């Protein structure tokens, strides 16, 4: 587009009809005898900004109930009912707090504790999808204090801003999930006198943005420099969910309960194991600083997945692994089915890997890849996958464990 200054051939703004000297500049539309003046351009930009901000406002009447949130999570995550209920209530409370700023409500940041593959990340992601708010994921192990090699803590804000397509108002009501938070535990309970740039130092840096601050972030991420344009993002209404496996946490909690239950009326260990709940003091003992623990008022514990749950994960949720493979085979005109024995064996092997639901795909991947590589096969219409085919997938084709069209 071409910018014109002055009265050139009596050109007028096609929007307001004014011409020089009433306006300073005209911008000509390419290939057309149409113009817009600098003042109409400014006015259009402001209208776009206002409409965008209006679209970013949170409307309480659109907030789902806790039961609706749990029902939605049930479609994606198998089991973990207590965790889903706690998350649903916490999320509703958080966004009600945004809708009623005049009421003094504590920010409901959440700590998810559970073994690898139990659904921590998927729960957080599904919440954001249902609420239609921007969502960003960060790995705590990649974060360092400002000035050290690695990702600045504020880069997690940049990722959220990018997910919001640089709509600051939308980003300021988004959700950030920080995984592997247990990996930045400090080495001892005492205050460190030496630099721990990826442990206690990161906790201190995260503390500021989690409790609420106006962060000055470079829109494209990376390190700040003096000549760089920065974007202001207020984090006080961003919901932070952090998660980790916290291995050996049970031993810390058990040691506490054993000490307190010595003598008359002491609980039995078997009962204690079922009811074990982690307290803030356990998290501090593990290596989280007290101030950081204090900014995570809701601690949600996810349970390890048994084989029954893993079988359900294979087949039931939206995007279940079995459904995905059935779709891929369907594209080749093949109806793929799995026997109950096959599903049980996959779940059994995944359980042995101790990687939860993540292990399911790993168990099936090679067998499915080998079979898909052979397709298409003329006349092949059905495949019935059994437990033995996990290790010998091509036996399906070689031994007639398939059906061809007549």
Swiss-Prot record:
GO terms for molecular function: ATP binding; ATP hydrolysis activity; ATP-dependent protein folding chaperone; protein dimerization activity; unfolded protein binding; zinc ion binding. The keyword Metal-binding applies. Keywords: ATP-binding, Chaperone, Metal-binding, Nucleotide-binding, Zinc. PANTHER family: ATP-DEPENDENT CLP PROTEASE ATP-BINDING SUBUNIT CLPX-LIKE, MITOCHONDRIAL (PTHR48102:SF7), ATP-DEPENDENT CLP PROTEASE ATP-BINDING SUBUNIT CLPX-LIKE, MITOCHONDRIAL-RELATED (PTHR48102). One of its GO terms (cellular component) is HslUV protease complex. Component of the ClpX-ClpP complex. Forms a hexameric ring that, in the presence of ATP, binds to fourteen ClpP subunits assembled into a disk-like structure with a central cavity, resembling the structure of eukaryotic proteasomes. Residues 1-56 form the ClpX-type ZB domain. This is ATP-dependent Clp protease ATP-binding subunit ClpX. Belongs to the ClpX chaperone family. It holds the Pfam family AAA_2. SUPFAM superfamilies: Glucocorticoid receptor-like (DNA-binding domain), P-loop containing nucleoside triphosphate hydrolases. Zn(2+) binds at residues 13, 16, 37, 40. PROSITE patterns: CLPX_ZB. The gene is clpX. ATP-dependent specificity component of the Clp protease. It directs the protease to specific substrates. Can perform chaperone functions in the absence of ClpP. GO terms for biological process: cell division; proteolysis involved in protein catabolic process. ATP binds at residues 115-122. It comes from Deinococcus geothermalis (strain DSM 11300 / CIP 105573 / AG-3a). InterPro entries: AAA+_ATPase (IPR003593), ATP-dep_Clp_protease_ClpX (IPR050052), ATPase_AAA_core (IPR003959), Clp_ATPase_C (IPR019489), Clp_protease_ATP-bd_su_ClpX (IPR004487), ClpX_bact (IPR046425), P-loop_NTPase (IPR027417), Znf_CppX_C4 (IPR010603).
